[in-house]
């Protein structure tokens, strides 16, 4: 007589707890400090394992922290995907970037016309959106082509790296320019303005006016610009370095965006292009990696193919899914988990939970979690829905503030939400797969370059919990492998839905 399956093939819920990493209890571990009886029991009482969510396991450079974009992409693809940062580094190492025909043409043209090259991007080594060392290759290429006027429009971080480190990173930018023999920092502005992605054009326009028209507070050095901020590196006000002279983007100049990730720079890129066009300035614009801008901006490095993932398999099988998240993570359960495809496929329903006004995550760590939870519970009760995919954003989004107390509250709110979702799953006979997409809240401090320990709101290289809650309790619970990666999630989901993994997937079902 055969042993009954511990999980019956049928409808389920994929629950991504953003920023849910695993680490030993510590004074800066918000997850261990928080009262989270549901999450604790989830891991202790149900089949669980730890999944690698950073570095080579997900298509990043070794030792690189995970992030929400690559996390959701790999969850959806069922295989590691070479991420843009890795592809850029490979292009640098092979010499392909330096010899790229488009880069060659842009630099030749601007050199021949005595125009200026404007390099715009985030200056840190957080490796989430950019890496300051990529400037070395771009500056060297400009020097080789004898481009005499190279202006760096520096965006300070304070989010993917420890706050109050902007001065050190701008010092590194100056060192790279000196080593290349060309380039100088012309403007400085915080990422809170230059990298808004929520459609707050009032913020973006400050960055546009700074770069295009030189409108900002005068500063005698990059360091003094950083010191002028009362809100840390993320909110350094628009600053024009007087020593750089006139560094406005002029007709015939070239602009090279060196962020490798699109989502937080594309709003700036689109608005700058529109502003320059409206003012009669023709500018040759190119990006280091591929952007999803309205404006067609040629890229030096193309992104990896992510087809053949979970979305394709669900559509081919005729299965219906509902995707639910609030605005901050909506693209992750739609665009990114679908392989950076914005198409709403047959059988997909997208539910975006929007907030009101500008978010203060420290003051409101619950965000819109109650409404997200209600939407998940409602979708779980529908008989026409095979798979609910939801992202609970609080642990990560509030964790990014670096505020330990607020992040503890966010963890506890998430715990209560998971309790409601698990109850809805039991009521509707659904299995649940709960997984983090990367670490964050389990480490809330970091040693700064000067040796001090400072609040840290960035991601980590820690593995993430992966838990399967079966849809039946009358059989022994299965045991999961001791190791896993995010690439195993999609094959496991398809197995639980009664389907085989797609041929493009290299991950394996964990049951």
UniProtKB/Swiss-Prot annotation:
Its cofactor is Mn(2+). Residues 442-464 are annotated as: Disordered. Keywords: Glycolysis, Isomerase, Manganese, Metal-binding. Mn(2+) 2 binds at residues 18, 68, 437-438. It catalyses: (2R)-2-phosphoglycerate = (2R)-3-phosphoglycerate. One of its GO terms (molecular function) is phosphoglycerate mutase activity. The active site is at 68 (phosphoserine intermediate). Transmembrane segments: none annotated. Its EC number is 5.4.2.12. The keyword Manganese applies. It comes from the Bacteria. GO terms for cellular component: cytosol. Binds 2 manganese ions per subunit. Pathway: Carbohydrate degradation; glycolysis; pyruvate from D-glyceraldehyde 3-phosphate: step 3/5. GO terms for biological process: carbohydrate metabolic process; glucose catabolic process; glycolytic process. It holds the Pfam family Metalloenzyme. Mn(2+) 1 binds at residues 396, 400, 459. SUPFAM superfamilies: 2,3-Bisphosphoglycerate-independent phosphoglycerate mutase, substrate-binding domain (SSF64158), Alkaline phosphatase-like (SSF53649). Catalyzes the interconversion of 2-phosphoglycerate and 3-phosphoglycerate. Monomer. This is 2,3-bisphosphoglycerate-independent phosphoglycerate mutase. It comes from Streptomyces coelicolor (strain ATCC BAA-471 / A3(2) / M145). The lineage of its organism: Bacteria, Bacillati, Actinomycetota, Actinomycetes, Kitasatosporales. The gene is gpmI.
